[in-house]
Regions:
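Short helix-loop boundary/capping segments
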Residues: 195-197, 202-304
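Extracellular carbohydrate-recognition regions
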Residues: 33-110, 131-143, 359
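Bacterial lipoprotein signal-peptidase II cleavage site
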Residues: 24-30
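Long, intrinsically disordered low-complexity tandem-repeat segments
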Residues: 111-133
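Short N-terminal edge-element motif at the start of the domain
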Residues: 138-212
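Bacterial N-terminal signal peptides that target proteins for export
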Residues: 1-9
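C-terminal motif of bacterial Sec signal peptides marking the signal peptidase cleavage site
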Residues: 20-22
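Long, compositionally biased interface segments
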Residues: 280-359
Length: 359
């Protein structure tokens, strides 16, 4: 399946280089008991600076001079004059979120109950304080097909109703709708310079309804929400300069109730880039991510990223790339729905900490 914000056969320009304040924050001693060591790569994890909104089609960005020149709006969940770090991509859609007015809603979750709910894969998150009562609220941007909401506890909701996007069962050669968030990393860490890469994330799929009926074809139709890191050779003196690799951490995929325990590698025509997919069971455990529970991933994924590079070398790629040439430059996460599905998920606690080697 096509990854990140790209549609098949379309090469989109690079990400906005805008990771400013909030990135590069090292762990303090006070945080040492609960927070993994290292420098946080995810900037503005609470989305306090909002999101720059993409146009509806990648070629607009490609031909218009980049994301910063072609973004159609900024979604502000709280008042801020700072430029957004996050980008929200709404590719191949009929409905533009630009101009949507924010509204505050009660999301129905009880603060006391929500604190501590998670799946089998990890410990409870901290959605509410102990003893806190009442319902949580969220700021919502929505239109006929999309719903993006940020709760007061930092939980992000991404909802996509593709029954309003597609007027027929999607065919194999047709683009599909995306709704995802992405950012570049400030001071991207090089693989050779870190001894650990601590990944954490909590995920809950609220619903995913297949509207295709008998027209459903699992070869071309699904609703999925992958997480991707970009690994790229940034050494201008290297023959592999500019060569990139998508390293995928699969999450929910409608087609598979049980997570796979094998890696996959394939060539993506649209971005002329290999995609290496980490065995998702190594990240989430042997769980059903679509069961309506919170699930948590928390582990050092550096060995898995190193394995991704090794797998590429086994295929004859990155042969002129030393570990010090390869940097982890950015991420994206969200819905890719190449079929008629109505789906919504929530995400919280996203963190990626690079623990540098101490000389």
């Amino acid at each position: 399946m096509r990854k990140r914000c790209y549609i098949v056969l379309v090469v989109i320009v690079g990400w906005l280089v805008g990771c400013l304040a909030g990135c590069g924050k090292a762990t303090s001693r006070a945080d040492a008991d609960t927070t993994p060591a290292g420098r946080e790569l995810i900037a503005d994890a609470q989305f306090e600076r909002g999101m720059a909104l993409s146009p509806l089609w990648p070629h607009i960005v490609q031909q218009g001079g980049g994301f910063s020149r072609t973004c159609t709006d900024t979604l502000r969940f709280v008042q801020s004059d700072l430029n957004p770090i996050w980008q929200l991509c709404q590719w191949s859609s009929r409905y533009d979120l630009a101009g949507a007015e924010p509204k505050r809603e009660t999301d129905g979750r009880d603060k006391a109950d929500e604190a501590g709910k998670t799946g089998k894969a990890g410990k409870a998150g901290e959605a509410g304080k102990a003893g806190e009562t009442g319902k949580t609220s969220e700021v919502v941007f929505e239109n006929e097909a999309k719903r993006v909401a940020l709760a007061e506890d930092g939980t992000l909701t991404l909802g996509l109703t593709t029954s309003r996007e597609y007027d027929h069962p999607r065919k194999a050669d047709e683009p599909w709708t995306h709704l995802l968030v992405q950012q570049d990393f400030d001071s991207p860490p090089h693989i050779a310079e870190i001894e650990a890469l601590h990944f954490a994330m909590e995920l809950k799929v609220d619903y995913c309804h297949n509207r295709l009926g008998e027209a459903f074809d699992e070869e071309i139709h699904t609703a999925q929400a992958p997480f991707y890191l970009m690994v790229r050779n940034g050494n201008k003196e290297s023959k592999d300069y500019g060569l990139g690799l998508w390293v995928g951490i699969p999450t929910f995929d409608y087609r598979y109730k049980r997570l796979a325990d094998t890696e996959t590698i394939h060539w993506d025509v649209g971005t002329a880039t290999y995609i290496y997919t980490i065995p998702p069971r190594k990240i989430w455990g042997d769980v059903d991510l679509g069961n309506g529970n919170w699930h948590k991933a928390a582990q050092d994924i550096l060995p898995l990223v190193q394995r991704a590079v090794e797998a590429m070398r086994e295929k004859g790629c990155f042969m002129d790339s030393a570990p010090e040439d390869l940097a982890i430059t950015g991420m994206n996460f969200g819905w890719e729905i190449p079929g008629t599905f109505d789906a919504s998920l929530r995400m919280r606690g996203l963190s990626l900490r690079a623990e540098e080697i101490q000389n």
